[in-house]
Amino acid sequence: MAGNFWQSSHYLQWILDKQDLLKERQKDLKFLSEEEYWKLQIFFTNVIQALGEHLKLRQQVIATATVYFKRFYARYSLKSIDPVLMAPTCVFLASKVEEFGVVSNTRLISAATSVLKTRFSYAFPKEFPYRMNHILECEFYLLELMDCCLIVYHPYRPLLQYVQDMGQEDMLLPLAWRIVNDTYRTDLCLLYPPFMIALACLHVACVVQQKDARQWFAELSVDMEKILEIIRVILKLYEQWKNFDERKEMATILNKMPKPKPPPNSEGEQGTNGSQSSGYSQS
């Protein structure tokens, strides 16, 4: 782990401007509304979380995989590579980078197949269509896009430090930690430094637990306007999330999602899976 966030590739290359992010997303917003795109973000974060839990990965590995996923689609359209392929690829790469140990090929494919069938069958009625050669090829494109900038900083460590400094670990840490986990269903990890996200999550936890921490926050040397921006995104997430019926809505949204086109000369090779067995756009 690099020692200084401000000198890291995470800060120098992967804290993005919101307007640039929205500009890159316009290709997908021709097919999806902003709300539908946001629901896709939640859904595929849930897929990565479920896959990581099935493989018994640490939460930091799952969080890193989620950041990789978001970084790729911050630069490319959803139709460039099928997100159903990208999700396990990100988990595979993150498990190596975070020194969890390489997840075996058999376990990864078995986990993806099982998770889609048991947890997300309402959205994916067919079998997981990819094999390890697809994941290794997808990993190459992911590494190329990220320019091998693989170290990701997360809000968990600064959150621990802040809660300990505040002296309310038992009261605040479990809730603030869950809120940090939820932020990965938004764009926050692409837009703000992790310590700011940690402070915003702690602030929300203080409000929920009715802990008066105004003095503690007032003494911080931090741009509170940015913290409030993050808090607004978190509150918006919870407001929209409670009205999101994933089981009813996702099949329709996935059908609208732009998809990779099959290579023109491989129609006969793809069998029943069509373009999904390729997973890559040729356009």
Curated annotation (Swiss-Prot):
Region (Disordered): 252-283
Cross-referenced Gene3D superfamilies: Cyclin-like
GO terms for MF: cyclin-dependent protein serine/threonine kinase regulator activity
Domain Cyclin N-terminal: 46-144
Location relative to the cell: Nucleus
CDD domains (alphabetical): CYCLIN_CCNC_rpt1, CYCLIN_CCNC_rpt2
GO biological process per UniProt: regulation of transcription by RNA polymerase II
Stretches with biased composition (Polar residues): 267-283
Cellular component aspect of the GO annotation: nucleus
This protein's record includes keyword Membrane: no
Domain of life where this protein originates: Eukaryota
Pfam families: Cyclin_C_2 (PF16899), Cyclin_N (PF00134)
Coiled-coil residue windows: none
InterPro entries (alphabetical): Cyclin-like_dom (IPR013763), Cyclin-like_sf (IPR036915), Cyclin/Ssn8 (IPR043198), Cyclin_C_2 (IPR031658), Cyclin_N (IPR006671)
Sorted UniProt keywords: Activator, Cyclin, Nucleus, Repressor, Transcription, Transcription regulation
Self-association state and partner proteins as the record states: Component of the Mediator complex. The cylin/CDK pair formed by ccnc/cdk8 also associates with the large subunit of RNA polymerase II.
PANTHER family according to UniProt: CYCLIN
Similarity comment: family membership: Belongs to the cyclin family. Cyclin C subfamily.
Function: Component of the Mediator complex, a coactivator involved in regulated gene transcription of nearly all RNA polymerase II-dependent genes. Mediator functions as a bridge to convey information from gene-specific regulatory proteins to the basal RNA polymerase II transcription machinery. Mediator is recruited to promoters by direct interactions with regulatory proteins and serves as a scaffold for the assembly of a functional preinitiation complex with RNA polymerase II and the general transcription factors.
Protein name: Cyclin-C
